[in-house]
UniProtKB/Swiss-Prot annotation:
It comes from Homo sapiens. The lineage of its organism: Eukaryota, Metazoa, Chordata, Craniata, Vertebrata. Residues 308-393 are annotated as: Disordered. Essential for proliferation of the inner cell mass and trophectodermal cells in peri-implantation development. PANTHER family: UPSTREAM BINDING TRANSCRIPTION FACTOR, UPSTREAM-BINDING FACTOR 1-LIKE PROTEIN 1-RELATED. Pfam families: HMG_box (PF00505). This is Upstream-binding factor 1-like protein 1. Residues 100-168, 222-288 bind DNA. The gene is UBTFL1. Keywords: Cytoplasm, Developmental protein, DNA-binding, Nucleus, Repeat. GO terms for cellular component: cytoplasm; nucleus. GO terms for molecular function: RNA polymerase I core promoter sequence-specific DNA binding; RNA polymerase I general transcription initiation factor activity.
């Protein structure tokens, strides 16, 4: 239930005070789960200033919705305090003096300009349906008009980057604080451990096997999108209106557009993906029947090793031929990883870069769960890093 602004407006300072009061007044036997402990909390003692005990309780319930659902009350209160302090540092950086405003993409410019006109034309239409109409109108724009939006975006983007560089020079203290608060120590330690583990695993492999991460067999059917979001992502990625964006900006924009389209359109993409999956299974079964027993065993071995960052043992097969590592898809991946999503081992050259996959997917959580369930039954091998090799059968 939303509180009135006069009673329910909480500043970050007020939230920190609430968490401190909770920490000081929590039950002494705080050994149970946080939900059990908070039910025995005396919220009258937590009350402060103009915030009653009931208001404090409701605010804590709102805060705890964004926290993990296990642990003691003390642990969750400490976690919430860290989040608020981190938010304060980030806001100081973003709201600092003269911080430049990020420019709108070409599509968002058209969307912002056209929204008032179309909302008057269709006063009773829902926002989702109106967004769908505007998306269609943008796709139907003449190339000359579309280029105007793209050029305006590029011009403002260049100005933004210049202003941002000046801002960082003039306010190095704010930049340094924002960098320190962007990644928690826990995350840093987790990434470092995973990085060291990957180094040890790769170094333990024979040199000939180290960087053959994906094996693709000649004639093997291409794996289709696993769900509706993947199909939408695939269709949007190569569209003309996305070509002027960088890899990172393109991923963000596709994620935003997915959130805007109506459920009926999402269901349509889902149906397309399911149909492609059925066709893929039929093609895969037919292709597997054409393999010799030796090649079939090699294929099963390679798919079994998928996802474990392991190469096929016994050195390179003379039947294997190396695919071009500088393909357009490989370049796109390298560009995406190059923006802070990979780590390179000290003392190795660029051909022996060991990537630690720590990026956040733009894909909704429910789709990622479905992907993990389908991954067990999938016989296709995804490229995580390194080179691709192809088998002639």
């Amino acid at each position: 239930m939303a509180l009135p602004r006069s009673q329910g407006h909480w500043s970050n300072k007020d939230i920190l005070r609430l968490l401190e009061c909770m920490e000081n007044n929590r039950p002494s036997d705080d050994n149970s789960t946080f939900s059990s402990t908070q039910s025995h909390m005396d919220w009258g003692k937590v009350a402060f200033k103009n915030f009653s005990g009931e208001m404090c309780r409701l605010k804590w319930l709102e805060i705890s919705c964004n926290l993990r659902k296990f642990g003691t009350l003390k642990e969750l209160v400490l976690e919430a305090k860290k989040c608020v302090k981190k938010m304060n540092k980030s806001q100081k950086y973003r709201n600092g003096p003269d911080f430049p405003k990020r420019p709108l993409t070409a599509y968002n410019r058209f969307f912002k300009e056209s929204w008032p006109q179309y909302s008057q034309m269709y006063p009773g239409m829902r926002s989702q349906e109106l967004t769908k109409i505007l998306s269609k109108k943008y796709r139907e724009l003449p190339e000359q008009m579309k280029q105007k939006y793209i050029q305006d975006f590029r011009k403002e983007k260049q100005e933004f980057e210049e202003k941002l560089a000046r801002f960082r020079e003039e306010h190095p203290d704010l930049v340094q604080k924002a960098k320190k608060s962007s990644v928690s120590k826990r995350t840093q330690n987790k990434v470092q451990k995973k990085f060291q583990k990957n180094i040890e695993e790769v170094r333990s492999l024979p040199k000939t096997d180290r960087f053959f991460k994906k094996v693709k067999f000649h004639g093997e059917p291409q794996k289709p999108p696993m769900n509706g979001y993947h199909k939408f992502h695939q269709d949007s990625w190569s569209s003309k209106e996305m070509q002027h964006l960088s890899v990172r900006e393109r991923m963000v924009e596709i994620g935003r557009r997915w959130q805007r389209i109506p459920q009926s359109q999402k269901d349509h993409f889902k149906s397309q993906a399911e149909e492609l999956q059925k066709q893929y299974k039929v093609k895969l079964d037919l292709w597997l029947k054409t393999l010799s027993p030796e090649n079939y065993a090699a294929y099963k071995e390679s798919t079994y090793a998928k996802g474990k960052n392991m190469a096929m043992t016994g050195g390179p097969d003379p039947r294997l031929k190396q695919a071009d590592p500088q393909s357009s898809s490989a370049k796109g991946l390298q560009e995406g990883f190059g923006e802070g999503q990979g780590l390179q081992a000290a003392g190795t050259d660029s051909s022996q870069t060991i990537w630690v996959n720590c990026h956040v997917s733009m894909e909704p959580e429910e789709n990622r769960k479905k992907d993990r369930e389908k991954e067990e039954s999938s016989n296709s091998s995804d490229c995580s890093s390194g080179e691709e090799i192809e088998v002639d059968v």
